[in-house]
Amino acid sequence: MTERLRIALIAHDQKKDDMVAFAKAHEQALARFDIVATGTTGSLILDACPSLSIQRVKSGPLGGDQQIGAMIAEGTVEVLIFFIDPLSPLPHDVDVKALTRLGSVYDIPMALNRATAEKLIKALD
């Protein structure tokens, strides 16, 4: 039996609706993965897609980004989809930079916007 790929879903506040729409559009494909998400993003996705099983960690500003970064470093998260809002100032910007840095260091597939996420989910499906 092969292990399922583990994918992380994260979205900044102004991008959460877009992440929910992405999850709804790809609910069947996402159901084939183990999913981890930051707290609020995970809750919103679960409300819209109750068939998905999502492990929720803390909210991003409360350490959730760092928790997922640790999972990337440990090799337990293999794909990152993170809808970043480049136009809003973020008090936890250093956490965001650290998370995307780890995605690059560990060379995992990483989508930081909807257009790239659409291509990535199709490639993984």
From Swiss-Prot:
GO terms for cellular component: cytosol. GO terms for molecular function: methylglyoxal synthase activity. It comes from the Bacteria. GO terms for biological process: methylglyoxal biosynthetic process. CDD domains: MGS (cd01422). Coiled coil: none annotated. Substrate binds at residues 12, 16, 38-41, 59-60, 92. Keywords: Lyase. Residues 1-125 form the MGS-like domain. Pfam families: MGS. It catalyses: dihydroxyacetone phosphate = methylglyoxal + phosphate. Its EC number is 4.2.3.3. It is an enzyme of class 4 (lyase). The active site is at residue 65. Catalyzes the formation of methylglyoxal from dihydroxyacetone phosphate. NCBIfam families: MGSA, PRK05234.1. HAMAP family: Methylglyoxal_synth. Belongs to the methylglyoxal synthase family. This is Methylglyoxal synthase. It comes from Brucella anthropi (strain ATCC 49188 / DSM 6882 / CCUG 24695 / JCM 21032 / LMG 3331 / NBRC 15819 / NCTC 12168 / Alc 37) (Ochrobactrum anthropi).
